[in-house]
């Protein structure tokens, strides 16, 4: 499992890299193993009620919804992809619903996961302070975990919720680059990990350090 590229990782399923989700049942047992159920393609861009998100007219974007389920807990996962073909942008979100009979505790619930192809990558991000926002830093992605985050209750100038992963020989005019940005104004966390096999993973979402959510049946 740890050698495979994943779209969204559960927990305690043999993938020892960064996970997107940490969920415990009423006994305190951790685990979530999602399997494919169905998918649909819809015109327009999905909406996130009560949350900031990108918007588009029906003809300007498409939405892919992939539905998955964990048989043990009854937890269902919807992966939402908003495709802006003309802008070369894909937006991501994840929706969790408890269809089981008992409450579940979420200790981590990321919005998206991105596994990159093999290769040597650099991480570009922007840090700052008062009157010195958006200071560029470029560093090699090593065999470890690098974190960009904020626990201020807002994204803040401390660390911008945005990063670029680029080939180490990439310049302003050539080379492969992947940009990841949180459309979110609260505390956030973006983790980058290069595994022992050379795969690079990005997990992006709400800050897990001060996050816990009791998900009741039907929610």
Q: Where in the sequence are the language-model features?
A:
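Polysaccharide-binding surfaces and accessory modules of carbohydrate-active proteins
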Residues: 3-202, 207-213
């Amino acid at each position: 499992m740890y050698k495979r590229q994943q779209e969204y990782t559960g927990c305690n399923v043999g993938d020892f890299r960064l996970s997107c989700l940490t969920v415990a049942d009423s006994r305190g047992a951790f685990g979530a193993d999602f399997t494919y159920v169905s998918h649909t393609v819809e015109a327009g861009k999905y909406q996130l009620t009560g949350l900031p998100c990108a918007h588009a007219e029906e003809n300007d974007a498409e939405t892919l919804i992939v539905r998955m389920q964990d048989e043990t807990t009854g937890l269902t996962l919807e992966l939402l992809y908003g495709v802006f073909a003309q802008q070369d942008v894909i937006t991501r979100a994840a929706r969790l619903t408890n269809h089981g009979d008992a409450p579940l505790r979420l200790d981590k619930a990321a919005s998206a996961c991105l596994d990159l192809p093999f290769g040597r990558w650099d991480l570009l991000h922007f840090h700052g302070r008062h009157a010195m926002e958006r200071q560029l830093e470029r560093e090699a992605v090593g065999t470890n975990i690098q974190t960009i985050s904020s626990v201020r209750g807002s994204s803040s100038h401390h660390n911008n919720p945005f990063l670029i992963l680029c080939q180490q020989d990439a310049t302003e005019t050539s080379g492969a680059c992947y940009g990841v940005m949180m459309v979110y104004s609260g505390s956030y966390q973006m983790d980058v990990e290069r595994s022992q096999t050379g795969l690079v993973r990005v997990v992006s979402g709400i800050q897990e350090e001060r996050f816990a959510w009791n998900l009741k049946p039907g929610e």
